[in-house]
A protein has these predicted regions:
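Short, hydrophobic transmembrane alpha-helix segments
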Residues: 21-33, 49-56, 82
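TM-adjacent membrane-interface loops and short helices in multi-pass inner/ER membrane proteins
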Residues: 153, 239-278, 282-296
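C-terminal luminal/periplasmic domains and tails of membrane-associated envelope-modifying transferases
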Residues: 387, 391-475
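Hydrophobic alpha-helical transmembrane segments in integral membrane proteins
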Residues: 228-239, 361-400
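A juxtamembrane structural motif centered on a specific transmembrane helix
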Residues: 2-3, 311, 345-381
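N-terminal membrane topogenic signal
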Residues: 1-12, 58-61
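Alpha-helical transmembrane segments of multi-pass inner-membrane proteins
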Residues: 7-24, 36-47, 66, 70-77, ...
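Structural signature of alpha-solenoid helical repeat scaffolds
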Residues: 191, 376-377, 410, 437
Length: 475
C-alpha cells in the first residue's frame, strides 16, 4: 500500500487539477459541490481501507484554519445581507479543507515530488487543451469567447500555468518537457497578475536558494512592492478594492456575509460594470467575513509557506508565494481550478515540515468524513436540481423548470434562486416574494417581481430594485 501511495497521490492531484480546471475553473456551485462529494468520498474510503497519519503542528494548524473558515463562512448566514449566499459559498471552502485533509492523512506515503508531478501534469494537460482551441480559432479566439477554454477565465488559467512552471523546479529534468506548453499558454493569456505572481515566485525561490544574491533579490522584491500601486493606477480593480474597503468599514466586526460583495458593488458603483468579486481575496474576505475571517484565511496561507521554508522545499514555497501574490489582485480563491492545486502543495509542505506522526484514530476520522460526505451529497443534490431547473428554463420548458426548482428546495430550503426560477417559470409574484423573503438584497428579484405586478406593488418593487442597483437600465 505504501508503494502505491505516491502514484495514487499524484493521480488524485492530476485528476482534480485537470478536472476542476476543465470544468470552467470550478467556479460554479455545481462544480465545487461535485468535487467536494468526490474528495470527501475518497477520504472516507481511504480512512476505512488504509487509515491515515495524524497531522503534525503545521498540518493541524492548516486544517484547523480551513475548518474554522468553513464554519465561519456558513455561520455568516446569521448576519448576512444575503443569507442564502453564505450556504452556497461554504462548500467551496469545505472542499479546500477536505483536499488538504486528504494529503495530510496520506502523510509521508506521498512525497511532495509526487504531488508536484500530479499538479504539473494536470496544468500541462489543460494548457495543451487551450493551445489546441486557440489554434482552431486562430485570430478569432477572443471574439468567439474561447480564449481561456476550458478554464473559462484567462487570469485563472494563466496562474495555473505559472504554478506549473514553478513546480517544475521540484521535478526531475525530463519533466521540463512541459515547460514550453505552460510558458506558451501563460504568454497567450496576457495576464499581468499571473506574470507578477510568476516573478514573485522566482524571486522567492532565489531568496531561498541563492544566499549570495539575497540582498539584490530583496531589493528587487521591494521595488516590485513599491511599484505595484502605480501599476494598478486607474485600473477598474481600484474601484472594486475601494468598494470592498467601504463594505468592511460598514460591517467592521463580522463583515456583510459570504458572497455579498456583489450586492455592495451594485449599490456603490459609479461605472456601468458588473462583478461578483472584489478581485482580491484579502479585501473581499475582510469585507464579507470581517477581521476573524481574514485572520483565518491568512493563517491558511501563511502556515504552509512557513512549513515549506522549514522543510527546505524552495519550489513549494515559491509556488505558494506565487499563488498568494496572484490572489491579491484577482478572485482566484473562488476558482477551485487553481486553488485546489495550491492546497495540494500547501498540505504537502505541512506534512514535510513535521516528523512522522502516529496513525490517526479511525474512530474520529470515519465519523468526521462520513458527516462531510453526507453534507456534500445534500449540497450537490440541491445544486444539481437547481442547475437542471435553470437549464430547463433556458430552453423554454417551464414545467420541468418549476418541478426541478421545487425538488431543489426539498434539499436546499434556503435557496432564493430556486424560488426565483419558479417565479420565472410560472410568472408567479408569490414565488418572487418567497425568494425576496430569503434574500431581500437581490435587486433582480425585485425587478422580476415588478414585471409581474401592477399598480402600487409594481411601483414599490421598482423603487427597491433601483435602490439596490441605481445604474440598472430598468425593466
Amino acid at each position: 500500500m505504501d508503494r502505491l501511495g505516491g502514484p495514487a497521490g499524484a493521480g488524485v492531484a492530476f485528476a482534480l487539477t485537470a478536472g476542476l480546471a476543465a470544468d470552467a475553473g470550478g467556479y460554479n456551485a455545481l462544480s465545487y459541490d461535485r468535487a467536494l462529494l468526490v474528495v470527501a468520498g475518497i477520504a472516507l474510503a481511504g480512512v476505512l481501507v488504509a487509515g491515515g497519519e495524524r497531522p503534525g503542528l503545521f498540518a493541524a494548524t492548516l486544517l484547523g484554519a480551513l475548518a474554522l473558515l468553513t464554519a465561519w463562512t456558513a455561520a455568516s448566514w446569521l448576519w448576512s445581507e444575503s443569507p442564502p449566499r453564505a450556504l452556497v459559498e461554504a462548500p467551496r471552502v469545505a472542499l479546500y479543507a477536505v483536499v488538504a485533509g486528504v494529503v495530510v492523512l496520506a502523510g509521508r506515503r506521498v512525497s511532495p515530488a509526487w504531488i508536484a508531478g500530479g499538479v504539473v501534469g494536470g496544468a500541462t494537460l489543460v494548457a495543451a487543451w487551450n493551445l489546441v482551441v486557440l489554434v482552431q480559432h486562430h485570430g478569432r479566439a477572443q471574439a468567439s469567447g474561447v480564449l481561456a477554454d476550458p478554464f473559462g477565465y484567462a487570469n485563472g488559467l494563466a496562474l495555473l500555468c505559472a504554478l506549473g512552471i514553478v513546480l517544475l523546479l521540484r521535478l526531475p529534468r525530463p519533466a521540463l518537457v512541459a515547460a514550453p506548453v505552460l510558458a506558451a499558454d501563460l504568454a497567450l493569456q496576457e495576464s499581468t497578475g499571473a506574470l507578477a505572481a510568476l516573478a514573485a515566485a522566482f524571486l522567492a525561490y532565489g531568496l531561498l536558494t541563492r544566499p549570495r544574491l539575497r540582498r539584490v533579490l530583496a531589493a528587487v522584491a521591494l521595488a516590485g512592492v513599491v511599484a505595484a500601486p502605480f501599476a494598478f493606477a486607474g485600473h477598474l480593480r481600484g474601484r472594486y478594492w475601494r468598494a470592498a474597503l467601504h463594505e468592511s468599514a460598514a460591517h467592521p466586526v463580522g463583515g456583510s456575509g459570504a458572497g455579498t460583495f456583489a450586492n455592495w458593488w451594485l449599490r456603490e458603483r459609479q461605472v456601468p460594470f458588473s462583478t461578483r468579486e472584489a478581485h482580491s481575496v484579502y479585501l473581499e474576505t475582510l469585507a464579507e467575513l470581517g477581521p476573524l475571517g481574514l485572520a483565518l484565511l491568512l493563517a491558511a496561507l501563511a502556515v504552509p509557506l512557513a512549513a515549506a521554508v522549514r522543510a527546505r522545499e524552495p519550489a513549494l514555497a515559491a509556488a505558494l508565494v506565487g499563488y498568494d501574490v496572484g490572489a491579491a489582485v484577482d478572485f482566484h480563491w473562488e476558482l477551485p481550478g487553481v486553488t485546489v492545486p495550491m492546497l495540494f502543495v500547501a498540505a504537502a509542505a505541512c506534512v514535510r515540515a513535521s516528523p512522522p506522526q502516529a496513525p490517526a484514530r479511525r474512530t474520529v476520522m470515519v465519523p468526521a468524513f462520513a458527516v462531510v460526505t453526507a453534507c456534500a451529497l445534500l449540497a450537490y443534490a440541491g445544486a444539481a436540481r437547481l442547475a437542471g431547473a435553470e437549464d430547463a428554463l433556458r430552453v423554454g420548458d417551464q414545467a420541468r423548470a418549476a418541478a426541478d426548482a421545487r425538488a431543489a428546495l426539498r434539499v436546499a430550503p434556503f435557496s432564493a434562486d430556486a424560488w426565483g426560477v419558479i417565479g420565472d417559470a410560472e410568472g408567479s409574484a408569490t414565488a418572487y416574494r418567497r425568494a425576496i423573503a430569503l434574500d431581500r438584497n437581490d435587486w433582480s428579484l425585485w425587478l422580476r417581481l415588478a414585471n409581474v405586478s401592477k399598480g402600487e406593488p409594481r411601483r414599490l418593487a421598482l423603487r427597491e430594485a433601483a435602490r439596490l442597483n441605481p445604474l440598472a437600465s430598468g425593466p
